[in-house]
């Protein structure tokens, strides 16, 4: 009996020494729109885990979807996937309830994937608020879009390397951003961004961010790309640059802090949206 108790005790001690598996956030969300009597209406809605989607009332023909990560932020090992489809002849604006915060990762890398599609004559505007990367955050982000030849697409992705107003900075960590955009079945835009290791040292280089800690990439695919180019360049000034070719307009801007970046983004987004403002949640 004594030897049996000792064996049980030893087994329990061994189990107690095993590391506890940390809980990770998982989420999947999908929205699809359809045209009903000239207005964009909900066709499909799916949400699972920490991924939530809310649909505020609008007073226009476009539908608006607000993406919510109910876990409150991301850390190593978290995984969220969003899918948004604008059906034929519809207009869909997708944004987020707040800035996505990516916290220090004790292990693993957070993953966020967005899969976008737009049907014939559709407009899809992907306008999430900024992603804030805290020190030692680790994030792998991917944006994929499959667009009909006659559709219009706007994508904005803004990043803050810490919050300057709070005295925070991302000095070390990992941020990988991958875009794959297909238009009419053809790959028209592909890019890879990688900030890894000594992030502050890397972004201080003149050829990278020259010490700026807020930056954004904007992509417009549509019939007005050439006409918009000089207007976008006038807004961006020395804080960014823009290029246009074959119906695609790419804009990159950077700033010293998040507030200064927003002062650039608001008029640029409005111009790309033919005068329509940014979603209201951006102003809250």
From Swiss-Prot:
GO molecular function: nickel cation binding
One GO cellular component term noted in the UniProt record for this chain: cytoplasm
InterPro entries given in the database record: UreD
Location of the region described as Disordered in the Swiss-Prot/TrEMBL record: 1-28
Protein's cellular compartments: Cytoplasm
Intrachain disulfide bonds: none
Chief subcellular location: cytoplasm
Claim: Chaperone is one of the keywords in the record: yes
Pfam families per record: UreD (PF01774)
Annotated keywords: Chaperone, Cytoplasm, Nickel insertion
Top-rank lineage group of the source organism: Bacteria
UniProt keyword Cytoplasm present: yes
TM stretches of this protein: none
Quaternary organization: UreD, UreF and UreG form a complex that acts as a GTP-hydrolysis-dependent molecular chaperone, activating the urease apoprotein by helping to assemble the nickel containing metallocenter of UreC. The UreE protein probably delivers the nickel.
Family as reported in the entry's similarity comment: Belongs to the UreD family.
PANTHER family: UREASE ACCESSORY PROTEIN D (PTHR33643:SF1)
Function statement: Required for maturation of urease via the functional incorporation of the urease nickel metallocenter.
Protein name: Urease accessory protein UreD
Taxonomic classification: Bacteria, Pseudomonadati, Pseudomonadota, Alphaproteobacteria, Hyphomicrobiales
């Amino acid at each position: 009996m004594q030897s049996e108790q000792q064996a049980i005790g030893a087994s329990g001690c061994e189990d107690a020494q095993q590391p506890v598996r940390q809980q990770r956030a998982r989420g999947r969300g999908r929205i699809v729109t359809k045209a009903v009597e000239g207005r964009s209406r909900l066709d499909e809605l799916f949400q699972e885990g920490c991924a939530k989607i809310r649909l505020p009332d609008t007073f226009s023909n476009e539908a608006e979807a607000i993406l919510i990560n109910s876990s409150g932020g991301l850390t190593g090992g978290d995984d969220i996937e969003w899918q948004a489809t604008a059906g034929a002849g519809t207009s869909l604006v997708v944004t987020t309830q707040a800035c996505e915060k990516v916290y220090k990762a004790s292990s693993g890398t957070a993953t966020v994937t967005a899969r976008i599609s737009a049907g014939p004559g559709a407009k899809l505007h992907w306008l999430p608020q900024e992603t804030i990367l805290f020190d030692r955050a680790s994030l792998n982000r991917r944006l994929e879009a499959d667009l009909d030849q006659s559709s219009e697409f706007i994508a904005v992705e803004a990043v803050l390397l810490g919050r300057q107003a709070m005295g925070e900075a991302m000095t070390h960590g990992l941020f990988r951003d991958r875009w794959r955009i297909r238009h009419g079945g053809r790959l028209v835009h592909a890019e890879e961004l990688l900030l890894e290791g000594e992030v502050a040292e890397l972004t201080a280089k003149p050829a990278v961010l020259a010490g700026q800690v807020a930056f954004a990439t904007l992509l417009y695919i549509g019939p007005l790309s050439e006409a918009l180019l000089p207007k976008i360049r006038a807004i961006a000034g020395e804080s960014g640059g823009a290029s246009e070719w074959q119906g695609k307009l790419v804009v990159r801007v950077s700033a010293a802090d998040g507030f200064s970046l927003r002062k650039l983004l608001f008029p640029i987004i409005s111009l790309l949206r033919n005068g329509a403002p940014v979603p209201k949640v951006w102003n809250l």
